[in-house]
Amino acid sequence: MVAVSKTKPPEDIKELYGLGQRDFGENYVQELTEKQALLPTDIRWHFLGHLQSNKVKYIASFVHLIHGVDSLKLLKEIDKQALRCQRVIDCLLQVHIAREETKFGFDEQELDDLLTSERAGLGALKNIRIAGLMGMASFTEDQDKIRAEFKGLRSIFDKYFKGPPTAPNASQSSAPQQPPTAISSAPAPILSIGMSSDYKIAIEEGSNIVRIGSLLFGARNKA
């Protein structure tokens, strides 16, 4: 579980940290860098928002997982900044599963081209690791629609990361094997779907990372 702490003060994060939570997610680069400088160094920081290429450099030295990678251009910039920091950065490719223009992400054909075409050049990006997929369901109370969107992403996930998702801290020996078209060497591929309003459906449909904000922190403060 990633505790979505955007707009929340460091004191609120410290409270959850004291209860054992270590994974926290932020949507804005400036807010993330400010909190990272103030809070314990063993926190695993996840970037959840739409990341602009020119801001990757500010988080490249410490970010644990970037959830919303939605272009090859962004992947290349993350790789460049990761090389500068002499590390490998885990990334999730965001897939556009909702029928809403406000959502970012690859469509299914774009994703296939990226992961299977040699022309995409993923093999040359040595300082990123595609660890799985991420998606956001439509903003609706229609649970059947949400379930259908999650189910569709699970099907896409299985195509490139074979076998059922397992918890990200599972042992490597029991992890599903990935096809050569996926460049990840992570022991447990990640399917990141589900937020406070739909996490139960997401887990039923195979999510192994949910992003929970309001259920943990209460209503979101205005940025």
Describe the residue ranges of each PLM region.
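Divalent-metal-activated hydrolytic enzyme cores
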Residues: 208-209
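Active-site loop ensemble at the mouth of alpha/beta enzyme cores that anchors a bound cofactor
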Residues: 223
